């Protein structure tokens, strides 16, 4: 996994900062960007795929959809539940860590 680069992902820094702020607010442990935006082969209207672990996952998901300054849609996956081995492998291979809580 690597760090965020606006050119690579097409996501404005303001939106990333809003995601990080919400992750802290809802005590999320880790937020990983994956999918076409992490791979760099996204289209202008591609959604933003996020994998999240820890914290108030449901509240974080709702807040990201409602409170970020983008019209792009979000697909938020809870890593603590129901993530298939195939999806976990994709996230591990292509994921970009946007936020990780320091203990």
Task: Give residue ranges: language-model regions.
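Catalytic core of pol beta-like nucleotidyltransferases
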Residues: 1-30, 38-44, 53-103
């Amino acid at each position: 996994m690597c760090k965020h680069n606006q050119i690579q992902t097409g996501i404005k820094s303001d939106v990333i900062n809003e995601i990080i702020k919400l992750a802290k607010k809802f005590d999320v442990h880790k937020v990983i960007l994956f999918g076409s935006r992490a791979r760099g082969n996204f289209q202008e209207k591609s959604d933003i795929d996020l994998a999240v672990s820890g914290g108030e996952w449901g509240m974080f998901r709702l807040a990201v959809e409602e409170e970020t300054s983008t019209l792009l849609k979000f697909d938020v996956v809870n890593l603590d539940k129901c993530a298939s081995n195939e999806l976990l492998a994709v996230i591990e291979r292509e994921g970009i860590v946007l936020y990780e809580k320091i203990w």
